[in-house]
């Protein structure tokens, strides 16, 4: 009976993880045709199984999804209350948080500074400059990390980006008719 209860708890947790990741994917889709050559990324911040902030990467060169989710939480609750809510929260994002400064500061820094307890990401970033580095930085800062929730859907969403990063060529679709 105890084992069954533990299995039920894990299954329930898995379903919640999938639900929150599905929402992050839906948010990411809002960036379609606006963020290229960057990937489409969505983010949901959750505290006590409730969404307290959400965001997506809205435009090339603009703030990333994680930062927009934090800003969304601050707009909803005010900065002081939001900072308390974000501390110890879980962050769901369809792609590994960036760990390099390019057009924007690394998202890993903001995640750590805000005291986020756990990061659940759908898949690693295929960009060789990031691939796994964001995860290492978060773990070093004692942030729990879980990878692979709805991984197939997360990779499919950004298949153009993945092809460019992994194969150094554009994503090609061939249509043929007779």
Model-based region annotation:
Residues 6-35, 48-51, 77-87, 100-178:
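Zinc-dependent deaminase
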Residues 37-40:
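Short, small/polar residue-rich loop motifs at catalytic or cofactor-binding pockets
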Residues 42-44, 94, 175-178:
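Short beta-strand segments
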Residues 58-71:
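A short, polar/charged loop-to-alpha-helix boundary motif
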Residues 59, 95, 123:
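Residues that line or immediately flank small-molecule/substrate-binding pockets and catalytic motifs
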Residues 86-95:
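A short, small-residue-rich loop immediately preceding and capping a beta-strand
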């Amino acid at each position: 009976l105890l084992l069954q209860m533990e299995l039920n708890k894990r299954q329930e947790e898995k379903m919640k993880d999938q639900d929150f990741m599905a929402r992050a994917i839906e948010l990411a889709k809002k960036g379609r045709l606006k963020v290229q050559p960057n990937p489409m990324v969505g983010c949901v911040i959750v505290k006590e199984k409730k969404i307290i902030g959400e965001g997506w990467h809205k435009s090339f060169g603009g703030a990333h999804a994680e930062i927009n989710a934090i800003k969304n939480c601050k707009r909803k609750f005010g900065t002081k209350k939001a900072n308390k809510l974000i501390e110890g929260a879980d962050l769901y994002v369809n792609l590994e948080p960036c760990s390099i400064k390019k057009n924007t500061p690394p998202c890993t820094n903001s995640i750590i500074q805000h005291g986020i307890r756990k990061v659940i990401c759908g898949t690693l970033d295929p960009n060789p400059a990031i691939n796994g580095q964001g995860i290492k930085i978060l773990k070093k800062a004692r942030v729990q990390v879980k990878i692979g929730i709805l991984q197939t859907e997360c990779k499919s969403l950004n298949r153009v980006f993945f092809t460019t990063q992994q194969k150094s060529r554009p994503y090609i679709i061939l249509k043929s008719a007779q």
